[in-house]
A protein has these predicted regions:
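Short alpha-helical patches at protein termini and domain edges
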Residues: 1-252
Length: 252
C-alpha cells in the first residue's frame, strides 16, 4: 500500500542517513538516551514496523536534533540527502502516516510474536489471534475519514490469510481449543466455519466410517457441553486446562 510503503521508505532513508554518519549517530543517541532507532524483528515486516515505532517514540528527540545549532552549522545540513531527512523529520504528514502504519501493524506484530514464540503451541492460537488482531485494527481506525484505508488494510490481510494460512487444519485446531472456541461460538458464521474445518480434517485423517461417527458424536457433546463435557469440573477447566488434557479427561 502506498500509504505505508512511502513512510516506510522515508523512515529507511532517515535511519540509513543517520547511521552512515558517526557524529550524527552519536548526537542522535545522546538525544534518545542511548537508544537506537533500528529495531530488528522476526520478519522484514516486523523490522520495518518496529523501526517505525522506535522513530515515533523518539519523534521529539529527532526534531530537536534536526533544528539544533549543531545540525544547522554542519556540512551535512547543506547536502541534498541531509535536506530531505530534515524535511521528513519536520513533516507533519510523515508523522501522521507513521501513526496510521502503527495503528494497522501493532496488532499484527503481537500475532507474529505469538506464532514465533516457544512458550505455547502456535496452531491453536493462530486463527483466534488473527480475528482478534483484525478487531483491534478496526478499533484503531474509528473515524469515517479512515474508512477507505481500513477497508483496504483488511482486504490485504484477508487475501494473505486465504493464500497462506486459511487451511482447515488451523480451523480444526481452534475448534478443539475450548478456551478460545466458546468465546467465538457466539458468532454463528465463525462457529460454522470452524465446525466445517473440523469435519473436513476428520474425514481426511480418520478413514474408518464408524470411528468418524463416534468422534463426530463426541464433537457434538463438546459443542453443546453435554455428556462428560457437562460436568462442573470440565466446564470450570475450559479456561485453564490445555485442550489435550481436557479432552483426555472427558473422552476416556
Amino acid at each position: 500500500m502506498k500509504e505505508f510503503s512511502k513512510p516506510i521508505a522515508r523512515a529507511r532513508q532517515v535511519t540509513t542517513f543517520i547511521y552512515r554518519h558517526g557524529r550524527l549517530l552519536d548526537a542522535m543517541r545522546e538525544k534518545t538516551g542511548g537508544r537506537d532507532l533500528v529495531r530488528p524483528g522476526v520478519t522484514r515486516f516486523a523490522t520495518a514496523f518496529l523501526t517505525l515505532r522506535s522513530l515515533h517514540t523518539h519523534k521529539d528527540a529527532l526534531k530537536f536534533l534536526f533544528v539544533s545549532d549543531d545540525w544547522t552549522r554542519s556540512k551535512l545540513a547543506r547536502t541534498e540527502a541531509g535536506k530531505k531527512v530534515h524535511d521528513t523529520i519536520l513533516s507533519t504528514k510523515f508523522w501522521n502516516s507513521v501513526e496510521d502504519c502503527l495503528r494497522a501493524s501493532q496488532p499484527l506484530i503481537v500475532l507474529l510474536r505469538i506464532v514465533d514464540g516457544d512458550e505455547r503451541p502456535a496452531m491453536p492460537e493462530v486463527q483466534f489471534c488473527m480475528e482478534y488482531a483484525k478487531k483491534k485494527i478496526k478499533e484503531n481506525f474509528p473515524t469515517r475519514g479512515k474508512a477507505d484505508l481500513l477497508k483496504r488494510i483488511l482486504a490485504i490481510i484477508d487475501k494473505r490469510w486465504e493464500d497462506q494460512m486459511d487451511q482447515p487444519l488451523y480451523g480444526a485446531a481452534l475448534y478443539l481449543n475450548p478456551n478460545k472456541y466458546f468465546d467465538l461460538k457466539t458468532d454463528d458464521v465463525m462457529a460454522g466455519k470452524l465446525r466445517s474445518a473440523f469435519t473436513e480434517v476428520l474425514s481426511k485423517m480418520v478413514p474408518d466410517q464408524d470411528l468418524q461417527n463416534k468422534i463426530d458424536d463426541q464433537a457434538l457433546e463438546y459443542e453443546d457441553l453435554r455428556g462428560s463435557f457437562s460436568n462442573k469440573i470440565a466446564i470450570n477447566n475450559i479456561k485453564t486446562k490445555s485442550p489435550s488434557k481436557l479432552f483426555t479427561d472427558c473422552t476416556i
